[in-house]
Amino acid sequence: MQSTTSVKLSPFDLMTALLNGKVSFDTSNTSDTNIPLAVFMENRELLMILTTSVAVLIGCVVVLVWRRSSSAAKKAAESPVIVVPKKVTEDEVDDGRKKVTVFFGTQTGTAEGFAKALVEEAKARYEKAVFKVIDLDDYAAEDDEYEEKLKKESLAFFFLATYGDGEPTDNAARFYKWFTEGEEKGEWLEKLQYAVFGLGNRQYEHFNKIAKVVDEKLVEQGAKRLVPVGMGDDDQCIEDDFTAWKELVWPELDQLLRDEDDTSVATPYTAAVAEYRVVFHDKPETYDQDQLTNGHAVHDAQHPCRSNVAVKKELHSPLSDRSCTHLEFDISNTGLSYETGDHVGVYVENLSEVVDEAEKLIGLPPHTYFSVHTDNEDGTPLGGASLPPPFPPCTLRKALASYADVLSSPKKSALLALAAHATDSTEADRLKFLASPAGKDEYAQWIVASHRSLLEVMEAFPSAKPPLGVFFASVAPRLQPRYYSISSSPKFAPNRIHVTCALVYEQTPSGRVHKGVCSTWMKNAVPMTESQDCSWAPIYVRTSNFRLPSDPKVPVIMIGPGTGLAPFRGFLQERLAQKEAGTELGTAILFFGCRNRKVDFIYEDELNNFVETGALSELVTAFSREGATKEYVQHKMTQKASDIWNLLSEGAYLYVCGDAKGMAKDVHRTLHTIVQEQGSLDSSKAELYVKNLQMAGRYLRDVW
């Protein structure tokens, strides 16, 4: 019988052999070729255990790798949860100091300027208090945040301008709507003490309406009024009104912000003259005055849209001694859109002759290239009075053309800034006198009543040559956009914004011929139809509540003499588009007035076409200089009193557009008379009827 050699391996040896890819054993004592098989057979149980273990081990490794990669992918897809300590704002820090919040709602910057001026003086008087100035538009990101934030206020001031026909300014509109509308909140502001200063014009019907309404609502909701509402009147000297109101405020703040044992007398305060830090530069080789770009998600006053002039034409006949321009802005491919009844804000430059005069008065070369800054060289804010936002680096000529309002009458603060830089002591004293309480009457007569411009005042005081930083921060206010009622409908002209603009050209009491900045630019504009190098302007659309009824079958009554026709041209274009689409329209009457049908009857052919097509039911015209007696739209309203009353009784909407100081007041009185007589009502009930029309949004006015 053949003998075999038994080979017994340890588990360690066998695993080593398997991992190395070979089996190591001693064959020196045998030549049997079946020894490897015998070895494996001898150790088969152990081999099976090891093989299974290796397989399980590999499987575990695979699963582990897969789970790690899956977890990593999941973490990559999910935002990591990072715990960030809550940032404690200055409002939430209770350092024992009393906090005062000063809000402003402004259209031209005056309310903001007063708010900052109050804070600057208050800081000097009450060193232990903390003051902050807040744009109402920035106070809360969402409407539901207003209540939460206001509850935390204990002392607040509101500087509120009234704009247009008793409307809030753009930056205060959202807050005003939230605060004055909606459900009653009860007396939830009992911890708040406040004061309100209004900015308006007594010539307008709704003088300081916004300030009055906010004041009433604050009291209704539990707040305590510190002083009566300040009634700033821009028709006179609004700075004097502000100064007088401040004198009522200080004693109240003394009680609230001074320690009981503080018997010191406040040091007389002299407002610092605001001044930019100015840096002069070599003009860049690629300097581009056109730094305006389109494509913003929203075009507004801070982000206007560059728009070319597509069409321009004169609307008056050659017989007219006046001028009225029809202008069309091209808004195709700009992202700008509008609705019928909206307004367009237009930024234009001062006339070249005006800029030439300003350059001479300042005494620097027109191509001086500079930048203005609101901080020091080390980045710290400039002290003293608050500064308006800076404009981009540019030449002096560009700055005077685009950013300086040099044709309006200077405010008293501007006179003081000029006085501070007058080298002639007599001139300096005279400027200080005009700005003082003692010089109030002379300021009112020599500057306000005479419509004396800033340029004229600087000409009268030639030694007053302020540096650029002072001139642009304290002397010349920022040139503001001009607003126009859009005279087209997007249903008729989706890529165009039409403007109807009367030329402003008049002699002032001082003898100066005043040329309107924007109306003159429009009259001289070069349209695309005449040149590829056409005129253009930065523009933006401001939303209006001047809208046709949502139901086209509701009757409408429109009253708009002269350029007051502008929004109604848009209304009628929209009604024509609706009619052509098969929509049933309600009755529409238009009262239009001008001097003479052969001289200034603007858009006559279009209006007749609206009547022929049924977009307009009736056109009622009044010509003030054709007959022996002058006839105006309010006279025509009286003649149509029965028709007007019947339409109002059917739910008609009544619209008025035009001059607020004259025509709109006359139309309002006539409407009151019609309601009283046709409705057989006494005066108080007629007044209530008209007021209810306004509150219901059925009596709308677009006036200036």
Curated annotation (Swiss-Prot):
<dbReference type="InterPro" id="IPR008254">
    <property type="entry name" value="Flavodoxin/NO_synth"/>
</dbReference>
<keyword id="KW-0472">Membrane</keyword>
<comment type="function">
    <text>This enzyme is required for electron transfer from NADP to cytochrome P450 in microsomes. It can also provide electron transfer to heme oxygenase and cytochrome B5. Involved in the biosynthesis of the antimalarial endoperoxide artemisinin. Acts as a redox partner for CYP71AV1 which catalyzes the conversion of amorphadiene to more oxygenated products.</text>
</comment>
<dbReference type="GO" id="GO:0005829">
    <property type="term" value="C:cytosol"/>
</dbReference>
<feature type="domain" description="FAD-binding FR-type">
    <location>
        <begin position="302"/>
        <end position="549"/>
    </location>
</feature>
<dbReference type="GO" id="GO:0003958">
    <property type="term" value="F:NADPH-hemoprotein reductase activity"/>
</dbReference>
<dbReference type="InterPro" id="IPR039261">
    <property type="entry name" value="FNR_nucleotide-bd"/>
</dbReference>
<keyword id="KW-0325">Glycoprotein</keyword>
<dbReference type="InterPro" id="IPR001433">
    <property type="entry name" value="OxRdtase_FAD/NAD-bd"/>
</dbReference>
<dbReference type="Pfam" id="PF00258">
    <property type="entry name" value="Flavodoxin_1"/>
</dbReference>
<feature type="binding site">
    <location>
        <position position="704"/>
    </location>
    <ligand>
        <name>FAD</name>
    </ligand>
</feature>
<dbReference type="GO" id="GO:0010181">
    <property type="term" value="F:FMN binding"/>
</dbReference>
<dbReference type="GO" id="GO:0051762">
    <property type="term" value="P:sesquiterpene biosynthetic process"/>
</dbReference>
<keyword id="KW-0521">NADP</keyword>
<keyword id="KW-0288">FMN</keyword>
<dbReference type="Pfam" id="PF00667">
    <property type="entry name" value="FAD_binding_1"/>
</dbReference>
<dbReference type="InterPro" id="IPR001709">
    <property type="entry name" value="Flavoprot_Pyr_Nucl_cyt_Rdtase"/>
</dbReference>
<feature type="binding site">
    <location>
        <begin position="161"/>
        <end position="164"/>
    </location>
    <ligand>
        <name>FMN</name>
    </ligand>
</feature>
<feature type="binding site">
    <location>
        <position position="563"/>
    </location>
    <ligand>
        <name>NADP(+)</name>
    </ligand>
</feature>
<dbReference type="InterPro" id="IPR023208">
    <property type="entry name" value="P450R"/>
</dbReference>
<comment type="similarity">
    <text>Belongs to the NADPH--cytochrome P450 reductase family.</text>
</comment>
<dbReference type="Pfam" id="PF00175">
    <property type="entry name" value="NAD_binding_1"/>
</dbReference>
<keyword id="KW-0285">Flavoprotein</keyword>
<feature type="binding site">
    <location>
        <begin position="630"/>
        <end position="634"/>
    </location>
    <ligand>
        <name>NADP(+)</name>
    </ligand>
</feature>
<dbReference type="InterPro" id="IPR017927">
    <property type="entry name" value="FAD-bd_FR_type"/>
</dbReference>
<feature type="binding site">
    <location>
        <begin position="199"/>
        <end position="208"/>
    </location>
    <ligand>
        <name>FMN</name>
    </ligand>
</feature>
<dbReference type="GO" id="GO:0050661">
    <property type="term" value="F:NADP binding"/>
</dbReference>
<feature type="topological domain" description="Cytoplasmic">
    <location>
        <begin position="67"/>
        <end position="704"/>
    </location>
</feature>
<protein>
    <recommendedName>
        <fullName>NADPH--cytochrome P450 reductase 1</fullName>
        <ecNumber>1.6.2.4</ecNumber>
    </recommendedName>
</protein>
<keyword id="KW-0274">FAD</keyword>
<feature type="binding site">
    <location>
        <position position="666"/>
    </location>
    <ligand>
        <name>NADP(+)</name>
    </ligand>
</feature>
<comment type="similarity">
    <text>In the N-terminal section; belongs to the flavodoxin family.</text>
</comment>
<feature type="binding site">
    <location>
        <position position="234"/>
    </location>
    <ligand>
        <name>FMN</name>
    </ligand>
</feature>
<keyword id="KW-0256">Endoplasmic reticulum</keyword>
<dbReference type="InterPro" id="IPR001094">
    <property type="entry name" value="Flavdoxin-like"/>
</dbReference>
<feature type="transmembrane region" description="Helical">
    <location>
        <begin position="46"/>
        <end position="66"/>
    </location>
</feature>
<dbReference type="GO" id="GO:0050660">
    <property type="term" value="F:flavin adenine dinucleotide binding"/>
</dbReference>
<feature type="binding site">
    <location>
        <begin position="516"/>
        <end position="519"/>
    </location>
    <ligand>
        <name>FAD</name>
    </ligand>
</feature>
<keyword id="KW-0812">Transmembrane</keyword>
<feature type="binding site">
    <location>
        <begin position="624"/>
        <end position="625"/>
    </location>
    <ligand>
        <name>NADP(+)</name>
    </ligand>
</feature>
<feature type="binding site">
    <location>
        <begin position="482"/>
        <end position="485"/>
    </location>
    <ligand>
        <name>FAD</name>
    </ligand>
</feature>
<feature type="domain" description="Flavodoxin-like">
    <location>
        <begin position="100"/>
        <end position="250"/>
    </location>
</feature>
